[in-house]
Amino acid sequence: MDLIEVTEGRTTFRIPVQDPNSPFPPSSAPVFFNPKMAMNRDATVLLLSVLNPEEYLDTMGASGVRGLRVAGECRIPVVINDRDPAAADLIRANLAGAGLEGRVTVEDANVLLSRERFDAVDLDPFGSPAPFTDAACRSAKRYLFVTATDTAPLCGAHLKAGIRRYATKPLNTEYHAEVGLRILLGYVARTMVKYDRGLSPLFCFASAHFLRLHLQAEKGADAADRTVARLGFLYHCPSCPERTEEPGVLPHDHVCPRCGTTMLPIGPLWLGSLSDMALLDQMKERLPDLSLSTERRLGKLLDVLKVELPTSSHYDYHRIAKWIGGSPPAIDVVIARLIQTGYRASRAHYSGTALKTDAPLDAIAAALSAQ
C-alpha cells in the first residue's frame, strides 16, 4: 500500500494514501485513519498523562495512532490490537519507525478482551461500541474509555436502532447531545454492575460527530449499588418546555404539572456529574506541557466542563425565548440573573445556545423578561 507521513501531537507515523474524492475514507483506504478525531486522541493523551496507568490497550488500533501517541507522549506501556493483519503490520512498522516499544496483537476484540485484563481499556470502534462493551467491562482493571460515533441512535434520531443497541428509550429533543451522552454512560454502567463492579465518570463529553467517555472502574457490590443509584429517567413534555428527572431503573407515569400533557420517558440513563472536577483541574494544568494541535479547543472544553451543571437536560435559549415571547437579553445575562436569585445556571459544552439551570420555568421566564 502507498503510505504518507503524518504528524499528530509529538508523534510521526505513516498511513495509507486515501482517495480525496472518496465520500468517506474507509471506502478507499486499506487501513482506516480519521484526522477529524484528533481532538478525541488529544483528550486521551492529556488524560493519560495525568492518570499514568500501568498498561493501556488500544482495542481497535487501525493505523495505531492512538496507541502510538500514548506510548510516545505519555511513556505508558501499550498493547495495540487490530483483527486485520495488514493493520497490524502497519502498526508494527509505525512503532519501529518511531523508536517505540509495544505489543501488537491480531485478534477479534471480544476474544482479546475476554482472555486478558488491562489496566486501561480503550474502545474506539467504527460505529457502536455496544457489541464490545460487555467484554470491555470485564477486561478493564481500573479505567475504561469508550467512543461512540453512532450518535443518531443514541440521540433519538434513529429510535429503533437506539432501543435495539442500548436497551433504552432515547428521544430526539433539543438537548439530544446530552441525552446521547447519558444514555451511552448509562448503558456502560448497566453492563458494569452485572459483574458487581461500579464506575465513576472522569471526563465525558459530546462533540459534533462522536461521544466520548473516560471512566474509572470500581470493585465490589457496594460500588455497583452506588452506580445503580445514579441511573434514572428524564421525563420530557412534548407540549411545553417542562422536564424533570427521577432516579430509578423503571419508568413511571408522569403528567406535566404545567400543561397536563403525558410526559415522555427517556432512559434509563445516567443522572448526575459527567466529570471529576479535581481531575479537570489537573488536566488544565498539564495541558500547556503537551504539544497538542487542539490545545485551545481542549482548554475551552475543560473550562466549560468545570462550571457546567450536572443536569440531564438543557433549554435551548432560542426556543425558550420564543416560548416566553419578547426580545431576550444575552444568554450570559440570563445566567447571571438566575445565579443572583439563588439558582444555579451555566452553559453546556456541546452547544452555544444551551442554558442549563435548576430554576423552574417561571424563574427562567422572569430572568428572560427582566429589563
Curated annotation (Swiss-Prot):
Identify the Pfam families for this entry: TRM
Where, in this chain's numbering, is Zn(2+) bound? 237, 240, 256, 259
Q: What EC identifiers does the entry list? A: 2.1.1.216
Disulfide bridge map? none
Keyword terms: Metal-binding, Methyltransferase, RNA-binding, S-adenosyl-L-methionine, Transferase, tRNA processing, tRNA-binding, Zinc
Instruction: Look up keyword Metal-binding and say if it applies.
Output: yes
Top-rank lineage group of the source organism: Archaea
Q: Which reaction does it catalyse?
A: guanosine(26) in tRNA + 2 S-adenosyl-L-methionine = N(2)-dimethylguanosine(26) in tRNA + 2 S-adenosyl-L-homocysteine + 2 H(+)
**Locate the Trm1 methyltransferase domain: which residues?**
4-368
Quick one: which residues bind S-adenosyl-L-methionine?
A: 41, 66, 82, 108-109
Question: Can the keyword S-adenosyl-L-methionine be found in this entry's annotation?
Answer: yes
Q: Which GO terms describe its molecular function?
A: tRNA (guanine(26)-N2)-dimethyltransferase activity; tRNA binding
Q: What InterPro entries does this protein's entry cite?
A: SAM-dependent_MTases_sf, Trm1, TRM1_arc_bac, tRNA_met_Trm1_C
- One example of a Gene Ontology biological process annotation: tRNA N2-guanine methylation
Q: Which family does it belong to?
A: Belongs to the class I-like SAM-binding methyltransferase superfamily. Trm1 family.
The record describes the protein's role as: Dimethylates a single guanine residue at position 26 of a number of tRNAs using S-adenosyl-L-methionine as donor of the methyl groups.
PANTHER family from the xrefs? N 2 ,N 2 -DIMETHYLGUANOSINE TRNA METHYLTRANSFERASE (PTHR10631), TRNA (GUANINE(26)-N(2))-DIMETHYLTRANSFERASE (PTHR10631:SF3)
Q: Which protein, by its recorded name, is this?
A: tRNA (guanine(26)-N(2))-dimethyltransferase
From what organism does this protein derive? Answer: Methanosphaerula palustris (strain ATCC BAA-1556 / DSM 19958 / E1-9c)
